[in-house]
């Protein structure tokens, strides 16, 4: 007769199972395990007296005959596709199986073979997510990359050359020479990286040479002049070479209004940065474009979520980031035109209903590179407290809301930028860029970050201690952050045209160069998983009130947030 144990005892030994609920950090978000792919009584667990031992849960199968390189045991997987429990098998830096691990000679239903050559990562009671993607990076300081990695990001896309004033304001790596230097620099960092060229030009020649030099995308920024002519030219080049276009529109409405920008886009796919407008864009109604079926709208994290401090901090940020002077009245007026509490409040709600598709950082240029996940979950928590359960929820949990919000910094930016065949979800065949979390620290401080199946970062105690846990415990680079393991564990994304033109041989870089694919007509707002709503947006030009399909979008600023000072005492 089978042995029975209580749910609490089972969760303590093997982690939660079907029907169990888990609180995410100190939020009001609760997930429920939808399905458990492990087998009761046949679970694999590593340790003294446990299951993964020779002749028990560990088989005699060689790597060549199918044993995996690494098994992650009893993980709660939180993904856009669902919330479930399973073992995860990794091989050659990719996810090769999700399901039941063990020894097929002794155990039934095994699809992940554990052999003598298999390493074990114990995920009992832990959450596993796909590594995050931050799609709005100003490459101002290389130290951003370590900060992002330690927060659970494994891919960064953007532009820049360092603390040049063009980079301080705009996410562009301008020209083939600068792109070459940045792609060369990418070899030094444990992070998947992708670079955007400058998209502001009225003739295609200079844009084409940037795509051929490795740009994965082109960025239109108002500080370089986002005119209708530049928009049309940039999108035409992008359509020819299959790269994405990101746009920061004309705050001052000098070369046209939001309707003129929509007209210049001509129904072509485009990623609209900080679509609410505090980060820049047609004042006061750039937010209207989130209702366009060809526009993929995103937020940057300083306005996530709307709090009592949001408005006050933005003016100074704007003055610094956009090279403005407090002694010039026009510069002050420019800055003030972008900060509107009504549109920021509406942004919260538009995220919650799935009309805004992506959250990113805007690193060091009105954005905090280490807080993409934190700000995403703070927004989700604020919306649950203020708006209650989503109508799509089934059962007494927040599973759908959690799936909607995690998609905003994993699968959706990957789809938008042509990377989703490689990254963005916990899925067989994709890169094993994975993050382990203690549920109490979910979204705030990872337990472990894997790049290409190797451990790149983790909190670690005193290296001279007799065990790994004594203080001081802080985040440290792990072995995938060093030597050839670094360049073999992460990649640099480039355009297909640049690969065809011999970019890798020309630069002699060590990292694999991987082409982006399907960034143009094959995707649209409808491709944004759980975040594809296209409401008709109206903005009152006098009061700045925002309506979606006639409904006023208004909410109060938060006075207290989860995932904040409780986690950062020092």
Swiss-Prot record:
It is found in: Cytoplasm. Ni(2+) 1 binds at residues 136, 138, 219, 362. Transmembrane segments: none annotated. Its EC number is 3.5.1.5. Disulfide bonds: none annotated. Residues 131-570 form the Urease domain. Heterotrimer of UreA (gamma), UreB (beta) and UreC (alpha) subunits. Three heterotrimers associate to form the active enzyme. Ni(2+) 2 binds at residues 219, 248, 274. Carboxylation allows a single lysine to coordinate two nickel ions. It is an enzyme of class 3 (hydrolase). The modification N6-carboxylysine is found at residue 219. The keyword ATP-binding does not apply. It catalyses: urea + 2 H2O + H(+) = hydrogencarbonate + 2 NH4(+). This is Urease subunit alpha. The lineage of its organism: Bacteria, Pseudomonadati, Pseudomonadota, Alphaproteobacteria, Hyphomicrobiales.
């Amino acid at each position: 007769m089978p042995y029975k144990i209580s749910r609490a005892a089972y969760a303590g030994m093997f982690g939660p199972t079907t029907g169990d609920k888990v609180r995410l950090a100190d939020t009001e978000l609760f997930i429920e395990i939808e399905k458990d792919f492990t087998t009761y009584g046949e679970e694999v667990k590593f340790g003294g007296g446990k299951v993964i031992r020779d002749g028990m849960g560990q088989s005699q199968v060689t790597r060549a005959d199918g044993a995996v390189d690494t098994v992650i045991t009893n993980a709660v997987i939180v993904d856009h596709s669902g919330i479930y429990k399973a073992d995860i098998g990794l091989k050659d830096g990719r996810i090769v199986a999700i399901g039941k691990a063990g020894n097929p000679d002794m155990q039934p239903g095994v699809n992940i073979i554990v052999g003598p050559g298999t390493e074990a990562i114990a995920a009992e009671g832990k959450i596993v997510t796909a590594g995050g993607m931050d799609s709005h990076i100003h490459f101002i300081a290389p130290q951003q990359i370590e900060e992002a990695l330690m927060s659970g990001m494994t891919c960064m896309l953007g532009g820049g050359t360092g603390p040049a004033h063009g980079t301080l304001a705009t996410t562009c790596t301008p020209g083939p020479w600068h792109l070459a230097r940045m792609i060369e620099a990418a070899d030094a960092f444990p992070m998947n990286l992708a670079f955007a060229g400058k998209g502001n030009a009225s003739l295609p020649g200079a844009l084409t040479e940037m795509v051929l030099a490795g740009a994965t995308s082109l960025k239109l920024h108002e500080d370089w002049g986002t005119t209708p002519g530049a928009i049309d030219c940039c999108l035409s080049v992008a359509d020819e070479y299959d790269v994405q276009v990101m746009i920061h529109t004309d705050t001052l409405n000098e070369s046209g209004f939001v309707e003129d920008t929509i007209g210049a886009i001509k129904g072509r796919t485009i990623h609209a940065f900080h679509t609410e407008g505090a980060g820049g864009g047609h004042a006061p109604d750039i937010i209207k474009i989130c209702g366009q079926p060809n526009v993929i709208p995103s937020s940057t994290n300083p306005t996530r979520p709307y709090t009592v401090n949001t408005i006050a901090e933005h003016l100074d940020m704007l003055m610094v980031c956009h090279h403005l002077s407090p002694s010039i009245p026009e510069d002050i007026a420019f800055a003030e035109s972008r900060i509107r509490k009504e549109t920021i409040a509406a942004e919260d709600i538009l995220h919650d209903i799935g009309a805004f598709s992506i959250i990113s950082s805007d690193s060091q240029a009105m954005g905090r590179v280490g807080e993409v996940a934190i700000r995403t979950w703070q927004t989700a928590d604020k919306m649950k407290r203020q708006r209650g359960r989503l109508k799509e929820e089934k059962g007494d949990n927040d599973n759908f809301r959690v799936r909607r919000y995690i998609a905003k910094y994993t699968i959706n930016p990957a789809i938008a930028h042509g990377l989703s065949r490689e990254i963005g979800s916990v899925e067989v065949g994709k890169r094993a860029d994975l993050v382990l979390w203690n549920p109490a620290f979910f979204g705030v401080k990872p337990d472990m970050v894997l790049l290409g199946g190797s451990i790149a970062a983790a909190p670690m105690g005193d290296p001279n201690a007799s065990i790994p846990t004594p203080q001081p415990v802080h985040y440290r680079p792990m072995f995938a952050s060093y030597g050839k393991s670094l360049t073999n564990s992460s990649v640099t994304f480039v355009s297909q045209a640049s690969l065809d033109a011999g970019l890798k041989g020309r630069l002699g870089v060590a990292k694999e160069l991987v082409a982006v694919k399907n960034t143009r007509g094959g995707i649209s707002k409808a491709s944004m998983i759980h975040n594809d709503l296209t409401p008709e947006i109206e903005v009152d030009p006098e009061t700045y009130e925002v309506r979606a399909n006639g409904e006023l979008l208004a909410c109060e600023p938060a006075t207290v947030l989860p995932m904040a000072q409780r986690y950062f005492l020092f």
